């Protein structure tokens, strides 16, 4: 049985495994932050996500998969951030060949 992209994503985030995380991101991926409007390609995203995963104050408190099929993943996560703020983050991903080709947070 194949492990879902959501389950793989949760595992690499829990383990703070940057290489494993980047393995889930398609080489042609676009990452978009709705709140700030920032956009990244995979090579730009590498340093951003690496810094987040190395910071112990960047914490995934709880997460649930709302929907996943071979083309799309939607999850809802409660996050804690370095500035002692907390947010609910909706993640919407388009999938291609088992990898994230487009990721947008809300």
Functional labels for PLM-detected ranges:
Residues 32, 46-106:
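A beta-strand edge to alpha-helix "cap/lid" segment located at domain peripheries
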Residues 37-38, 61:
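Sparse recognition of residues in long alpha-helices and their boundaries
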Residues 16-20:
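Short helix-adjacent coil turns
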């Amino acid at each position: 049985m194949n492990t879902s992209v959501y389950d793989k994503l949760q595992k690499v985030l829990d383990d703070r495994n940057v290489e494993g995380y980047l393995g889930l991101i398609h080489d042609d991926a676009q990452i978009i932050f709705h709140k700030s409007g920032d956009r990244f390609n995979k090579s730009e995203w590498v340093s951003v996500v690496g810094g987040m995963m190395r910071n112990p104050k960047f914490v995934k408190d709880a997460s649930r998969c709302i929907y996943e099929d071979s083309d799309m993943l939607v999850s809802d996560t409660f996050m804690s951030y370095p500035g002692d703020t907390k947010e609910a983050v909706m993640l919407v991903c388009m999938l291609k060949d088992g990898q994230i080709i487009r990721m947008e947070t809300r």
